[in-house]
A protein has these predicted regions:
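Short linear motifs at protein or domain termini
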Residues: 1-111, 115, 219, 223-246
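C-terminal all-alpha effector/ligand-binding and dimerization domain
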Residues: 2, 126-133, 138, 177-246
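Short helix-capping and inter-helix turn/linker motifs at the boundaries of alpha-helical repeat units
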Residues: 24, 122-123, 185-186
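Solvent-exposed, non-membrane alpha-helical residues enriched in polar/charged side chains
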Residues: 34, 38-39, 54, 133, ...
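Hydrophobic packing residues in well-ordered alpha-helices of helical domains and bundles
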Residues: 98, 125, 144, 148, ...
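Hydrophobic, amphipathic alpha-helical faces that serve as interaction scaffolds
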Residues: 101-114, 147-184, 221
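Amphipathic alpha-helical dimerization/coiled-coil segments
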Residues: 108-133
Length: 246
């Protein structure tokens, strides 16, 4: 899985000088932009201009260009030839496609995790579940979203299916983005606790039902989040128009 820690921190050698090479600069920039898109700092449709990003992140345009290519491959960025890139705007069709894939992928991952998990993996899943609950209670929205995504990633690891893990890595950014649309963090944490319990008891039938319900919750959360943002935009527009007419 991708590191969602503090991506702006640069590595240094023993003498205190920077040891970042071209490759590590590209990785760092990619992580910064990926997190900012998933966390909602850079909104859908916003411009990603190489020159501006290079200045902002203190690098040349080469790692910016490579990072944008990588993020386009992950489905987070729309590259436009001979002009700037933009943060991808997921259409209803895009969301429907992702939900169809997740319906198969998530349920299979949870079922296999319930069947094949080991003690070490289960302990890792429990720790991540507990962390997500704590972050939710503390009101750490970004942290709770990242922890929720980590929970799903660990479940895929526990499936013991290498191909599922590879597919999970391919879908990782899209799924993290979708999970970041959840506003009811406590409800998500509660469902994760129920899923963990079913996995721990190797109850495949129960975990299948819970996973299907969890997917339904995810879709509902996304729809509510979209409605809330649209309402906020409308209210902001009305407020500006009212101020201009005064």
């Amino acid at each position: 899985m991708k590191n969602n820690g503090s991506p702006r921190t640069e590595s240094a050698g023993q003498d205190g000088t920077r040891s970042d090479g071209p490759r590590s600069e590209t990785v760092r920039v990619t992580e910064v932009l990926r997190n900012e898109i998933i966390d909602g700092i850079r909104l859908p449709g916003s411009k990603l201009v190489e020159r501006n990003l290079a200045t902002e992140l203190g690098v040349s345009r080469v790692p910016i260009r490579e990072a944008l290519k990588q993020l386009a491959a992950e489905g987070l960025v729309a590259n436009r030839p001979n002009t700037w890139s933009t943060v991808r705007e997921f259409s209803p069709s895009d969301i429907a496609d992702l939900n169809e894939v997740r319906t198969v992928f998530d349920i299979l991952s949870f079922e296999l995790a319930a069947q094949r998990h080991n003690r070490e993996g289960l302990a890792k899943l429990e720790a991540t579940m507990a962390k997500g609950k704590e972050l939710s209670k503390a009101g750490d929205v970004v942290g709770a979203h990242r922890s929720a995504a980590d929970f799903h990633a660990i479940v895929t690891e526990l499936s013991g299916n290498r191909l599922l893990v590879e597919i999970g890595e391919l879908l990782d950014s899209r799924m993290r983005w979708q999970l970041s649309q959840h506003d009811d963090l406590d409800f998500v944490a509660t469902e994760h606790a129920q899923l963990y319990d079913a996995i721990a008891h190797r109850d495949q039938a129960k975990v299948r039902d819970l996973a299907a319900r969890h997917l339904g919750t995810s879709q509902e959360q996304h729809d509510k989040h979209k409605e809330r943002l649209a309402k906020a935009v409308d209210e902001g527009t009305e407020s500006r128009e009212g101020a201009e007419s005064d």
